[in-house]
Amino acid sequence: MIISHRHRYLFVELPRTGSTAIRDELCGFYDGEPILSKHATYQEFLGAASVDEKRYFVFSAIRNPLDDAVSRYFKLRTDHKGRFSHARPGGHRRLVNRLLDNAMFGFLRRTDADFPTFFLRYYVLPYDTWASLSHRRFDFVMRFENLAADFEKALRQIGIEPVRPLALVNPTGARQRDFAYYYPPETWGRARRVFGPYMEKWGYGFPAEWGIQGPSTLHRAQYLLCGLVARFYWRVVRPLT
């Protein structure tokens, strides 16, 4: 999480949305400074912020979950920056995330599984992120798919003139194609059920060639039910781990 008291902004870092690139730019060129933890939620900030800081311009980013799942797979498969084989105890990853990452990393090391196998094994419950807690309340939400242009828009809304184009930081290794390439037809039904409600919520659509219109009523109900549990975890349990 990055704050600037000079420019009165707060950047909330949702994982795998280009937050490292944004963080580096804000701290290097726009008077930003880290506070709390890298992936602290806005609720955690509100618990520590002054009345004046709560009025700051708040922005973050969102990403298509179809793309996010592929990125996660390749980060695990390539042991991105030794993050999984040499993970530090604690760190900015919370306990549940570390346990899940360790399980996924171990599975890929043992099996060398391709993405469809990985996806069908680990993407079972409705997909959600803690963007569902408060992103709707933010002043601006960037799209990972249009990150450089959206970052410039955010800066100008804050009242800052960009000093340079956004630099690419922390790219996922080994991945060479658009996310749709990694989803064969046997994964489409699962993707619709797991990702559909979240994609609908944030205005994403499935690739046209899939012929998928969106989630069913049952899928939406499952998403809402699981979301109750997820929000309790993000609000109450996650800050303690």
Region spans (language model):
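Membrane-interface amphipathic segments in extracytoplasmic regions
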Residues: M1-T241
